[in-house]
Amino acid sequence: MPDIANTAPALQTGTLDWVGMGEIELPFIFESHGITPVTVNAKARAFVNLHKEDAKGIHMSRLFLALDTLSTEQQVNPQTLAQALDFFISSHEGLSDKALIEFKFELPLRRKSLLSDKAGWKSYPVILTSTIEQGVINYELSVDVTYSSTCPCSAALARQLIQNAFAEKFSQETLSQKEALEWLGTTQGIVATPHSQRSIANVKVKLDSNITQFDVVNLINTIEDELKTPVQAAVKREDEQEFARLNGQNLMFCEDAARKIKALLETQQYSDYWLQINHYESLHAHDALAIAVKGVAGGYRA
């Protein structure tokens, strides 16, 4: 059968940085430290470069079939990704010397409630990118962690209104503890509440080229532990009350959240990182953002 990619001349010559496919539907079994291998449904991208200037194109079917083998016959881990990248290059000998595989998927994790004995599922968006260039493999991991952020300014303003209401109600009275507690338990007592919003920490890290396993769960857990207010799964009343307490004791502007995560990542063994904090404001019609990078030469840029 005719092979146009090999035999037909290019209409115009020139090298290309990446050629391949995107939005490939691909279920696969994902391996990560801390969980049993789990089947996820991903959208994949697969690319090689084209450094032969007069080549008509690449062999996309070879990339597709290599991913299909990864999906149906293997589990996704650093070793199998390295094998797939090597095949991308070897199957394009003379055409390509760089390759990329990217998976976007949601990782389901069981999450315990704060105080009750309940648990539920939470899904975490993950992007796993692997590349090879000049024989060197690089892995990059991106996760989104959703949490609640309560505005420190709004909390201060709410406290002031509560103080004013208290002074107005009891300005001329000697107050017993019982009366104070009863009043604080009414809507008249708590006349204002601070605003909070669902927020997302998007964190991207570069992994060591020699890793033998991915550890997505540890990255997610350490971020949630640092922020203190991750969005919950199963919730009973005691859990909701504890969540309210945690929000009140961990007030955060986007700058605060970014500095927390930056300080956390500095203690880890990642060669580089990039983070963006997104506070989807409930007061404003716009979002509040903060971005930070490790700052290594030639690394991620803000």
Swiss-Prot record:
Its EC number is 3.5.4.16. It catalyses: GTP + H2O = 7,8-dihydroneopterin 3'-triphosphate + formate + H(+). The record marks C151 as: May be catalytically important. It comes from the Bacteria. One of its GO terms (molecular function) is GTP cyclohydrolase I activity. Keywords: Hydrolase. InterPro entries: GTP_cyclohydrolase_FolE2, GTP_cyclohydrolase_FolE2/MptA. The keyword Hydrolase applies. One of its GO terms (biological process) is tetrahydrofolate biosynthetic process. Pathway: Cofactor biosynthesis; 7,8-dihydroneopterin triphosphate biosynthesis; 7,8-dihydroneopterin triphosphate from GTP: step 1/1. Belongs to the GTP cyclohydrolase IV family. Converts GTP to 7,8-dihydroneopterin triphosphate. This is GTP cyclohydrolase FolE2. It comes from Pseudoalteromonas translucida (strain TAC 125).
